[in-house]
């Protein structure tokens, strides 16, 4: 796929949209940016990142009338709207960042493990990524978890990966046609996003697009929608809590089995709960499909506590717990981290915002955060977006200062959470370096 001199409109200016602008401009496209609502400070912020970028706002129809060849959609924008359907009828092409990545990995030959489902996909993606890393593969974990895929690709500067582990939402799959995963799963289907789809079957059909190509299908035998996704002539691995399948739970003994072969006791799996038994079965099946050895996979399952720098407890001092989520580089990841923690929180936010809107954090922080500490170049924007939501916000010149001030205010039972919702490159070499500084500041208390 060539973009040289193509006129492309990128719609939606969150993290995914920003990554598409960066990738497409690097590859010679004439790119413009669109968002239905654009504040002047947002235009200024993004304009500093991309010299000469043209912005459109208001009606998408008006923006599309300027002779664009391609519309690159962020996942939050449905292509099922009249303006976009008319654009396609008139010969325009619509795609998203996953389709752009598919073109890259198809040409380069990277293996891909793709994961979707109504529930459990983040856990399975994290576990699969962890297992691949522990087995020595050069692994990229991206998509609906962590960094947008093109941001991850740009950071790698074109270097081939052993495997991409992608969490994909139905929104991301809508305009993805060329992805051919080495192995893929739909974990389950339940009612979700029905404000965007005609009905549950329409939603399931969108999820099933993950199975294009001839890769291994990993399917939930207990879910009627998933059973219907089996494709003729394809290798299929079934997992089940109810039946004897390729991977199944022997309830009498509490052990996971592969056919007649004993695999692992559920009590040896750090992830608690019956639903996580299905997640482990799916993860092992996916990893075996890219050639990883079963014995090693099962040993590493026993040590899985979550990805490094992703909601990871690093220590405790005088009853105050410190949690590192430096890999939380976008608003969605930070909101999820906050939602998963029950104790009162002091949250450290900030860095390079990548043009994101931080207002969704207002609801996430409400009733849970006792204070917010702001660092980095986009701290002023975060303060503006959170203004008026009854939060005590403190500006800090360094991450070390934020850690010290958070600890000074915290009481036993509180949590100090680093989950910046931002990229790190304004102050650090990367999210891992940011994590190192956070850990160092904790140890220095």
From Swiss-Prot:
Q: Which SUPFAM superfamilies match?
A: MurCD N-terminal domain (SSF51984), MurD-like peptide ligases, catalytic domain (SSF53623), MurD-like peptide ligases, peptide-binding domain (SSF53244)
Pfam families, per this entry?
Answer: Mur_ligase_C (PF02875), Mur_ligase_M (PF08245), MurD-like_N (PF21799)
An example of a Gene Ontology cellular component annotation for this protein is:
cytoplasm
What GO molecular function terms would the record report?
ATP binding; UDP-N-acetylmuramoylalanine-D-glutamate ligase activity
Database matches in Gene3D superfamilies: Mur ligase, C-terminal domain, Mur-like, catalytic domain, NAD(P)-binding Rossmann-like Domain
Keyword hit for Ion transport: no
- UniProt pathway: Cell wall biogenesis; peptidoglycan biosynthesis
Q: Which GO terms describe its biological process?
A: cell division; cell wall organization; peptidoglycan biosynthetic process; regulation of cell shape
Q: What is its EC number?
A: 6.3.2.9
Q: Which UniProt keywords apply?
A: ATP-binding, Cell cycle, Cell division, Cell shape, Cell wall biogenesis/degradation, Cytoplasm, Ligase, Nucleotide-binding, Peptidoglycan synthesis
Instruction: Please state which protein family the record places this protein in.
Output: Belongs to the MurCDEF family.
Q: Please report the name of this protein according to its UniProt entry.
A: UDP-N-acetylmuramoylalanine--D-glutamate ligase
Q: Which organism is it from?
A: Neisseria meningitidis serogroup A / serotype 4A (strain DSM 15465 / Z2491)
What is the gene name?
Answer: murD
């Amino acid at each position: 796929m060539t973009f040289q001199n193509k006129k492309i409109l990128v719609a939606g200016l969150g993290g995914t949209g920003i990554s598409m602008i960066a990738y497409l401009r690097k590859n010679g496209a004439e790119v413009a940016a669109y968002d239905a609502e654009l504040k002047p400070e947002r235009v200024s912020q993004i304009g500093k990142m991309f010299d000469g970028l043209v912005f459109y706002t208001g009606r998408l129809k008006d923006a599309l009338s300027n002779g664009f060849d391609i519309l690159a959609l962020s996942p939050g924008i449905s292509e099922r709207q009249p303006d976009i359907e008319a654009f396609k009828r008139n010969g325009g092409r619509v795609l998203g960042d996953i389709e752009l990545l598919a073109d890259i990995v198809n040409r380069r030959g990277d293996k891909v493990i793709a994961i979707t489902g109504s529930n459990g996909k983040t856990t399975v993606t994290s576990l699969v990524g962890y297992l691949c890393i522990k087995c020595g593969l050069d692994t990229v974990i991206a998509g609906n978890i962590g960094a947008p895929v093109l941001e991850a690709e740009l950071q790698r500067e074109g270097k081939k990966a052993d495997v991409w582990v992608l969490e994909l939402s139905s929104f991301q799959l809508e305009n993805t046609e060329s992805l051919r995963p080495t192995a893929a799963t739909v974990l389950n289907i339940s009612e979700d996003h029905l404000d965007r789809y005609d009905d549950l079957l329409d939603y399931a059909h969108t999820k099933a697009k993950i199975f294009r190509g001839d890769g291994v299908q990993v399917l939930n035998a207990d879910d009627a929608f998933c059973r219907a996704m089996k494709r003729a002539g394809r290798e299929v691995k079934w997992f089940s809590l109810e039946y004897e399948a390729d991977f199944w739970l022997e309830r009498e003994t509490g052990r996971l089995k592969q056919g007649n072969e004993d695999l692992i006791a559920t009590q040896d799996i750090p992830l608690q709960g019956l639903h996580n038994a299905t997640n482990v079965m799916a993860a092992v099946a996916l990893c075996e499909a890219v050639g990883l050895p079963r014995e090693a996979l099962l040993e590493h399952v026993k040590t899985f506590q979550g990805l490094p720098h992703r909601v990871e407890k690093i220590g405790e001092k005088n009853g105050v717990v410190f949690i590192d989520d430096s890999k939380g580089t976008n608003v969605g990841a930070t909101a999820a981290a906050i939602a998963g923690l029950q104790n009162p929180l002091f949250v450290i936010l900030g860095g390079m915002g990548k043009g994101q809107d931080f207002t969704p954090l207002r609801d996430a922080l409400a009733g849970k955060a006792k204070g917010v500490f702001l660092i980095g170049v986009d701290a002023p924007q975060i303060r503006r977006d959170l203004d008026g939501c009854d939060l005590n916000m403190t500006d800090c010149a360094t991450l070390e200062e934020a850690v010290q001030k958070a600890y000074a205010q915290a009481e036993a039972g509180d949590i100090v959470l680093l989950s910046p919702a931002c990229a790190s490159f304004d102050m650090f070499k990367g999210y891992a370096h940011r994590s190192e500084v956070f850990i160092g500041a904790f140890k220095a208390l």
